[in-house]
């Protein structure tokens, strides 16, 4: 009401207030992370630290007062940088593996032979492809755990974000990893390897696949494709926004998420089955089944609120 009285659209006023609140919370969180820094001069090696999520962790640990080292094939050797992680050695308080999933699997296995004494964790989107390397580190009595940040490298405020901790048999390591994020407002979730990948098959695998199918159908629509680019509707624009984000991300990472998950085919089958069911309902002019489908979906989505 106050916005209307001063000539500002309520939606715009709400958006401005939301931005201001998030900006304030972001500053508070950053100040707290710096003030309660867990680093105290301790050292951390981020393998894959020149990548997008790798850089996020480099910045995060720098802000906590860690002496941060980066190993990445795309950088040159320097006092705190290595093009080959093996050249960095293993004498670090924390070692983070932030490389593509298949690369991470090999690095974890190699680390198990070197037996670092510090905390070790990966940040992979999938865990089943890393099972052997994680178990090898556990069997070598290393301080190993596994994390999955459910947020992207552009994230500044961790409030409302989720960080999954996958204990692989060393609770002390998992607890130490959690301590690193105590000064943030991130929501910590605990899962085992198999439950994690079953859920991720739907949370990431299905949502990615749905958007890939969506923009593939649009781009393959023939003569309609250029005309579609000029049309707009609330639902279409919302879906398009998500699909554009998916299409702009790493196709290599998205393929890994689809291909390497032991549980990845199930949601793809469910997507195909659902699309076929919808097609048959429409082809058969079955309004009753269509309404039931919509109501069933609404009931499920309402239950998530």
Regions flagged by a language model, labelled:
Residues 227-302:
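Interdomain hinge/lid region at the active-site interface
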Residues 56, 62-81:
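NAD(P)-binding Rossmann-fold cofactor-contacting core
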Residues 1-43, 64-67, 72:
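N-terminal hydrophobic or amphipathic helices and topogenic motifs
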Residues 52-53:
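Hydrophobic/small residue at the entry helix of a nucleotide-binding pocket
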Residues 44-48:
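Conserved N-terminal Rossmann-fold NAD(P)-binding element of oxidoreductases
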Residues 126-191, 197-200:
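Rossmann-fold dinucleotide-binding core
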Residues 161, 174-175, 180, 196-222, ...:
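Active-site-proximal catalytic alpha-helix in oxidoreductases
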Residues 85-137:
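Rossmann-fold NAD(P) dinucleotide-binding segment
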């Amino acid at each position: 009401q106050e916005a209307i009285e001063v000539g500002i659209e309520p939606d715009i006023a709400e958006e401005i207030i939301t931005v201001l609140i998030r900006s304030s919370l972001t500053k508070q969180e950053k100040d707290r992370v710096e003030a309660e820094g867990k680093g105290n001069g301790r050292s951390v090696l981020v393998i894959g630290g020149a990548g997008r999520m790798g850089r996020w962790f480099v910045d995060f640990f720098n802000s906590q007062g860690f002496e941060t080292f980066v190993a990445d094939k795309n950088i040159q050797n320097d006092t705190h940088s290595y093009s080959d992680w093996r050249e960095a050695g293993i004498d670090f308080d924390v070692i983070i593996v932030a490389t593509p999933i298949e690369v991470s699997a090999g690095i974890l296995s190699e680390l198990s032979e070197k037996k670092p004494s510090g905390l070790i964790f990966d940040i992979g989107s999938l865990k089943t492809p890393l099972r052997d390397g994680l178990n090898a580190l556990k069997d070598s009595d290393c301080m190993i755990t596994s994390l999955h940040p459910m947020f992207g490298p552009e994230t500044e405020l961790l409030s409302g974000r989720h960080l999954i901790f996958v204990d692989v048999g060393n609770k002390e390591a998992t607890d130490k990893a959690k301590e690193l994020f105590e000064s943030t407002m991130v929501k910590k979730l605990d899962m085992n390897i198999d439950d994690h990948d079953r859920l991720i098959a739907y949370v990431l695998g299905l949502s990615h696949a749905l958007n890939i199918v969506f923009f593939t159908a649009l781009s393959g629509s023939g003569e309609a494709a250029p005309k579609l680019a000029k049309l707009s509707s609330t639902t279409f624009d919302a879906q398009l926004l998500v699909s554009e984000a998916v299409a702009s991300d790493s196709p290599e990472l998205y393929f890994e998420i689809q291909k390497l998950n032991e549980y990845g085919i199930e949601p793809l089958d469910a997507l195909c089955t659902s699309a076929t069911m919808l097609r048959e309902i429409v082809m058969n002019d079955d309004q009753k089944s269509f309404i039931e489908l919509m109501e069933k979906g609404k009931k499920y989505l309402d239950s998530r609120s």
